[in-house]
């Protein structure tokens, strides 16, 4: 049940009835201060100015047509034209009862579901996952879960880097120093081999040429190169899957559609782009010149899609990739979770595929970019010697710190329980610290902040959840007994908690639309804070009557279910006690 949508719809109808043209819109938002009601309507003053009428007069006229009978108990006009809406407690109570009884907490499926490809994580083969992969992996996974929940058909794709120049380096290097690859060797060893191969590639021109030759051989299906490539891929994806499992990321082998998948499409893509006059020969290479992008001299920017040695580029693969996703996967929308440095590359690809007619002009392509992670000194988050921190090492450090945190609060904790709690807290702390930040901004990685039991952190919200579980247990009622009572919202804090609980639907809708999980994190934190205030002012166990006790227990139960559900959409597990 989406309160924001209900009020927005009625406001729009009231504005039309008041003679306001349909292209004028106002903002409906939850009130920050309780003295301004539960919701505020902003923007009428700007509309009135455009229409040349007094803003208070327009607000009064709109309110006269506003049909919120049974929903709002009071509607006020404040100042020159702000509209404050106070929701009816009885109406809220009926909606709370509906939400508690619903497996989906009263949240309906979207009316027009789409097939949405979510492209995220995308590590390179033969390299260990590092902290640079954490934002794409965690944010992309949460967004995929949320889109899935509201009813879209979500196709998760892990577009791994399993093709390209770095394979030429590795294959050429292995031919020289280590012809056989044991399938059981650790990924860390391959990572070392890659760095050695890269050093040789950068300093030895003859080796660099041999590496480029190996790339072409691989792309042409050379059996020796393919055999080595297959072993490298298998070792890497098996190791990466362990990290996904550890982080509770909903990616598996079935979601892998790497760059190599599109290799057979590339010759036809090149031929087609030439036939359509989009691609031309330039200095031996095949290039597409885009008027939409200029070089430093102001000339159309050339995008190379095939080198003069016949090798293809990431650009070529990405063109084929979008074509495949539209034609074969029937995607209505594609969302990319890659960092901001890829933005121009993606815009160029999108321009090419639209010009080529590979996708409709109206197809939605979104780049949900994200910022960087810094250390406390404001430098890129790396090891002391300046290399990227391995993701496994980061998770191990989080686990160690979580164990110490738990023991500092309870030295007598059972060892098995300690390990389980440490696993949950460590993973949730890292994921929540990532998800609670606006993805477009940079942030500072701070262990003390993310493991704190105060503020907008995973430990705080997990503790709030366990606190409610304890209250429900101490009530000596089972769930069925709790639900037999009526819901009463007689006190201010009962009303405020009910409003916040019913704002879950609109929060999920916003997060799904914008791909910004930090909005959901902010909601869950605010809900936990509001419950704490409710619990402080409204006794539950020692309520004045059984009716009041059961009513407040229902509010507690729905808060518990909402916290658990919201965390699950973020890919975070809950615990029953801490």
From Swiss-Prot:
Q: Which reaction does it catalyse?
A: tRNA(Arg) + L-arginine + ATP = L-arginyl-tRNA(Arg) + AMP + diphosphate
Name the Pfam families for this protein: Arg_tRNA_synt_N, DALR_1, tRNA-synt_1d
Query: What EC number(s) does its UniProt record assign?
Result: 6.1.1.19
From the record, give the transmembrane residue ranges: none
**Predominant location:** cytoplasm
- GO CC, alphabetical: cytoplasm
Q: Which PROSITE patterns match?
A: AA_TRNA_LIGASE_I
- Give the UniProt keywords, A-Z: Aminoacyl-tRNA synthetase, ATP-binding, Cytoplasm, Ligase, Nucleotide-binding, Protein biosynthesis
Motif 'HIGH' region mapped to chain: 123-133
Q: Which GO terms describe its molecular function?
A: arginine-tRNA ligase activity; ATP binding
Q: Which cell locations does it reside in?
A: Cytoplasm
Keyword Cytoplasm part of the UniProt annotation:
yes
Q: Does the keyword Hydrolase apply?
A: no
**Biological process per Gene Ontology, one example term:** arginyl-tRNA aminoacylation
What family is reported?
A: Belongs to the class-I aminoacyl-tRNA synthetase family.
Subunit arrangement? Answer: Monomer.
Name of the protein this chain belongs to: Arginine--tRNA ligase
What gene is this protein a product of?
argS
């Amino acid at each position: 049940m989406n309160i924001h949508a209900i009020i927005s719809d009625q406001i729009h109808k009231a504005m039309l009835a008041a003679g306001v043209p349909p292209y004028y819109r106002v903002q409906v938002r939850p009130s920050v201060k309780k003295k301004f009601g539960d919701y505020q309507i902003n923007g009428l003053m700007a509309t009135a100015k455009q229409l040349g009428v007094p803003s208070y007069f327009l607000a009064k006229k709109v309110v006269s047509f506003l049909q919120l009978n049974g929903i709002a108990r009071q509607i006020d006009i404040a100042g020159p034209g702000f509209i404050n809406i106070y929701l009816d407690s009885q109406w809220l109570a009926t909606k709370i009862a509906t939400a508690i009884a619903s497996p989906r907490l009263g949240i309906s499926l979207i009316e027009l579901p789409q097939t949405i490809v979510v492209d995220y994580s995308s590590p390179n083969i033969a390299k260990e996952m590092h902290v640079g992969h954490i934002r794409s992996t965690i944010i992309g996974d949460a967004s995929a879960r949320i889109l899935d929940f509201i009813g879209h058909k979500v196709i998760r794709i892990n577009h791994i880097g399993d093709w390209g120049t770095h394979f030429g380096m590795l294959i050429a290097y292995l031919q020289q120093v280590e012809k056989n690859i044991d399938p059981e060797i650790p990924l860390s060893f391959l990572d070392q081999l890659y760095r050695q191969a890269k050093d040789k590639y950068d300093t030895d021109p003859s080796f660099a040429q041999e590496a480029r030759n190996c790339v072409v051989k691989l792309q042409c299906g050379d059996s020796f190169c393919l055999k080595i490539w297959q072993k490298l891929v298998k070792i890497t994806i098996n190791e990466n899957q362990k990290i996904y499992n550890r982080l509770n990321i909903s990616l598996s082998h079935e979601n892998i559609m790497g760059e190599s998948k599109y290799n057979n499409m590339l010759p036809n893509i090149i031929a087609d782009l030439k036939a359509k006059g989009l691609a031309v020969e330039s200095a031996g290479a095949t290039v597409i010149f885009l008027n939409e992008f200029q070089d430093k001299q102001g000339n159309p920017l050339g995008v190379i899609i095939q080198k003069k040695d016949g090798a293809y580029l990431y650009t070529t693969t990405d063109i084929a990739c979008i074509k495949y996703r539209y034609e074969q996967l029937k995607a209505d929308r594609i969302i990319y979770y890659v960092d901001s440095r890829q933005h121009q590359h993606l815009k160029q690809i999108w321009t090419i595929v639209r010009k080529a007619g590979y996708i409709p002009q109206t197809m939605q392509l979104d780049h949900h970019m994200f910022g960087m992670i810094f250390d406390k000194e404001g430098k890129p988050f790396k090891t002391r010697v300046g290399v990227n921190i391995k993701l496994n090492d980061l998770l191990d450090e989080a686990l160690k710190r979580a164990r110490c945190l738990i023991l500092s609060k309870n030295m007598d904790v059972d060892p098995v329980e300690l390990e389980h709690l440490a696993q949950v807290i460590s993973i949730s702390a890292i994921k929540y610290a990532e998800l609670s930040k606006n993805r477009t901004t940079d942030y500072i990685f701070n262990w003390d902040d993310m493991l704190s039991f105060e503020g907008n952190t995973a430990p705080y919200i997990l503790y709030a959840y366990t606190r409610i579980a304890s209250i429900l247990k101490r009530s000596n009622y089972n769930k069925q007994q709790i639900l037999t009572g009526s819901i009463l919202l007689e006190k201010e804090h009962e009303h405020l908690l009910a409003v916040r609980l019913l704002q879950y639907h609109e929060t999920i809708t916003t997060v799904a639309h914008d791909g910004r999980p930090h909005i959901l994190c902010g909601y869950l934190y605010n809900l936990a804070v509001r419950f704490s205030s409710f619990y402080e002012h409204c006794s539950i166990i020692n309520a004045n009557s059984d009716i009041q006790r059961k009513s407040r227990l229902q509010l507690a139960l729905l808060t518990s279910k909402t916290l658990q559900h919201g965390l699950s959409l973020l890919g975070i597990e809950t615990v029953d006690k801490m």
